[in-house]
Amino acid sequence: MLVGIDVGSKGSCNLMAACGTINSTFSLYTSATTKNGDGDRKFNAMQEVTLKVVEGYATRNKAPPKEMIIFLNASPGDQINLYQENYCRKLQENIKKAYNNHEVQLTVVMVNLRNSERFFTAENNPRNVAPGTLVSSTIVSKNYDFFIISQQSNKGSIVPNHYKVIMSESKLEEGHLQELIFSQCFNYVNWLGSIKIPAILMYARKCARFSAEVMNGMDVSSGLQSRLYYV
């Protein structure tokens, strides 16, 4: 199961949304929103929307997912240890409580979209590197992190995404996870080609913003939760 989590706001309406896949081909989805906040309220909101999309998966498949890969829209200053303690580990505990001690293999990836790094081709007339370029050595930390450029641009310089894997229980090797991330940038229904971020995270962003800006925080009917009504 793939899950994306992002936030959206308009005025005093500040929402968090999650979107999750509910089939093996990553083509069917469920979504959920809740009020967002700061500190503990933010992590509680993350738990709430994640558990809601897990419930959507379990309803369709008669069982919760065995493995989850979760993408979080993060900021450069976000502290990894807070997310590990207040989100990752608590999520596993909550899933165990809700589903009869069910253990889920969890991989959580923080996605930083705002970076100062830029990458160019090594030639006399430097250009943006091609989509699919991976940078996983030299300028990255000793932790599990890497840069991926997934989109094409002919104007200006491309801002790469910085992916930080803060929990990894998946059987996926590092290279396979990177391939999955890049392939998911082609899975967005409203664009021909690749987008900047994995589609599941873009759907979460669209859901949060639509719910805040158009729905003003109102809940949608249960029948719409399995539809991409916000795209």
Describe each PLM feature range.
Residues 1-231:
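Long, contiguous domain-sized segments
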